[in-house]
Swiss-Prot record:
Gene3D superfamilies: 1.10.287.3980. One of its GO terms (biological process) is translation. This is Large ribosomal subunit protein bL34. Keywords: Ribonucleoprotein, Ribosomal protein. PROSITE patterns: RIBOSOMAL_L34. One of its GO terms (molecular function) is structural constituent of ribosome. InterPro entries: Ribosomal_bL34, Ribosomal_bL34_CS.
């Protein structure tokens, strides 16, 4: 049985990247929360 995590840079960016987050209202909330918390890295 193969492992479940097969890393791909393109997929990672597409799904969890900054632009992907900004595209949806929920994603914008994520960015907002992470900014408020003071995260060094907002996405990926």
């Amino acid at each position: 049985m193969k492992r479940t995590y097969q890393p791909k840079k393109h997929h990672r960016k597409r799904v969890h990247g900054f632009l992907a987050r900004m595209r949806t209202p929920g994603g914008r909330r994520v960015i907002k929360r992470r900014r408020a918390k003071g995260r060094k890295r907002l996405t990926v």
